[in-house]
Amino acid sequence: MRLESVAKFHSPKSPMMSDSPRATASDSLSGTDVMAAMGMAQSQAGFGMAAFCGKHELSQNDKQKAINYLMQFAHKVSGKYRGVAKLEGNTKAKVLQVLATFAYADYCRSAATPGARCRDCHGTGRAVDIAKTEQWGRVVEKECGRCKGVGYSRMPASAAYRAVTMLIPNLTQPTWSRTVKPLYDALVVQCHKEESIADNILSTVTR
């Protein structure tokens, strides 16, 4: 079973899981099986499970748990980022909370997010390659140039920058870009990494 099946399981129309075989191909995972598998995955990949469940609106509690996990990670690696490492006590903690909150919000975006769907590909991540279509006489697609194939626009990092300047008024855009934004980007990437870890663990325990 993959993580995407967890979201389907929580849908009222999906009381049984049939996409992942157990002993035989005809077996289905019952609700008890799914809950047990999720419990095992959460014990081994709490961050990734919380991130995914919060992303899919399965639990408001998981959203906050994911942000807390992300803040812990941010504290752990903040020494590598000069713009954050030099901050003191309470200010540093608040900045890391802002970065974690905005980074998680960026991770949660999808083509279904209101206003986020790519205008060029309409959420498909694909666009017509006009030159090759004319050359070959048939429709040839390519990765959408606007959204880079994901189907939606990312949350502007400028939103996080504006929030951070409420705590560090003298933080200039160039300094943000060089010394703080790299941490923000790393937090977004970490969310995706943790989701991937959770997905692999869930797949393993339901194999």
Model feature map: region roles:
Residues 1-108:
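N-terminal alpha-helical interaction blocks
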Residues 3-6, 136, 150, 168:
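Intrinsically disordered, low-complexity regions
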Residues 101-117, 123-125, 134-139:
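Short, flexible, mixed-charge glycine/proline-rich loop motifs
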Residues 118-121, 144-147:
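Short cysteine-rich clusters marking metal-coordination/redox-active sites
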Residues 132-134, 160:
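N-terminal low-complexity, intrinsically disordered patches enriched in charged
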Residues 139-145, 153:
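Transmembrane alpha-helical hairpins and terminal membrane-anchor modules
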Residues 148-207:
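Long, charge-rich boundary regions
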